[in-house]
């Protein structure tokens, strides 16, 4: 399937209900003190600091000492994405992440933001499946999976374009759209693309938005300490109302192969 490319120390959680809409808005500034609002599956955990004793303030989706480690961190409460069976609320999310290889050159595999029908990890496996799906269910339209992957290993059997890309996944880890990781800046001569190495260990910020009127998914990434780039990395037209149920769970998933790599989420906001 292809789609058209359109060229908490502090935790705040609010649920606003009216006859017209149900809105969810939350913000995790960091995850150092833990919270029962996040459920962990597989090898995911509150990340250890470099001393191995204290917490880093991040969610770790994989563990350094477990080969082929993979896991999910999911919000325990489902989010209402639809007021009825057909319509879909617009939504936007942003988060800071880092991918840090511990062995070279065998890094892998990556992490993803996910919207899934269950807060369990019974369908996910490691390696290129990123703890999203597995060999058996990959591509099944009944998965009702929406994900944005940040992939650092080229798995040609799964259609990966290179070892440093961002992709939109619909019911499959074979991305419907994928592009080289990076961001756009405006110069005197027009737009200039600058590549970002996802597995550099640097902290990057990702912004993911869905416009329900135009059925457009946009993905933007940049350095965490800089403002959001004005031009999205990806703008793709797809009707997510056919994928997302009225209530879904959201969170993150990640995996690695033989190469040891740390996949961490440092903060997270969501609003619909």
Model-derived regions: residue spans:
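Polar, low-complexity loop segments and adjacent catalytic/binding residues used for recognizing
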Residues: 2-272
